[in-house]
Amino acid sequence: MIYLDNHATTRLDPRVLEAMLPWLTDHYGNAGSATHEMGREARAAVDAARESFAAAIGATAREIVFTSGATESANLALLGTAARVAATEPAAARHHVVTCATEHHAVLDPVAHLERQGFAVTRLGVCPQRGAGVPGRIRLDDLRAALRPETCLVSVLLANNEIGVLQDVTAIAEIVHAHGAVLHVDCAQALGRMPMDVDALGADLASFSAHKFHGPKGVGALYVRRRGRAVRVEPLVFGGGQERGMRSGTLDVPGIVGLAEAARLAVAGLADEVPRMRALRDRLWEALARGIPGLALNGPALDGHDAAGRPLRLVNNLNVQVSGVDGQTLLATLARDEPAVSSGSACSSESPRPSHVLLALGLDEDQARASLRFGLSRFTTAEEVDTAAARIAAGVARLRA
């Protein structure tokens, strides 16, 4: 199987599995059981993993809360912050949330829930595919205009899971903090694909999923700033009081060990993997463009950089528009003979509606439906890229005939 859907999930690295196996078999103690050796060794493994993961993202160990993944982390960040505000602020005093129209549904849906609970919500648009600005980026002037004295929280996606655009989070953080609001950053797609330092980004809260960087599914983390501008969130789950009371439930020791090892490997391999994945991504684009007349790129230019020299797009991301072809029909054709690709977020891939991200870029519904998303990984090879491009071009030719 040629797998090019690495924004949906990634292959578990064998080295991560090796690190996890002892905690699935011989060392299966509960990290909350301090009365015997098996419990204490499980707790020691969790503590070591917390230190390791914190180092990988530029945090301290006490700023890490282990969760089931970025969706839970985002919900805890957003709903937990809102609950804190509701408990400590007069009604409507700080009950305004700002986010972006191109966020993942792990953010959009809890924000919609807050709106139903009485919070005011502003959803920022982004620069269009054709027009001024970087396609998919938030206009900073729009953010400034959206902020109010009652704004308590802003949530942005560092790296978009569909079009790969990288938001200028450091600039966003300066604006948000000047207004006294809390900034949540969805970092699910970023770790292992770009340098990661949550403190330098200016994030107050940041969410992560292990399975996005070759770790196990079902485990993630929430970064909660405790240095300088320390923030507090209310828990959403109650019971055993684990994770300093912020996330009750028996800790997934094997998963947490796997998360930390996957993050360590992602950071250790960054210098080699970033240029390698960029070269493969560009190779894929060039091969597709040669084989498919009229192919168009969705999102920022592949070689685009901002004024500070920072890339505008994830190195492993490609999103293309195939005119005259329905994306779902093409995917069904490809499913018979590979490669594995998608038309958008895995969390909404069964929806008949076109991608909300592409619609926010200004594409019409037909253009959005005619788009394909590719995500490369450390396991993607040049041979796979070449074969995938040839098969996709052949599939498009059959559908256009």
Question: Model regions: which residues?
Answer:
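Pyridoxal 5′-phosphate
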Residues: M1-A401
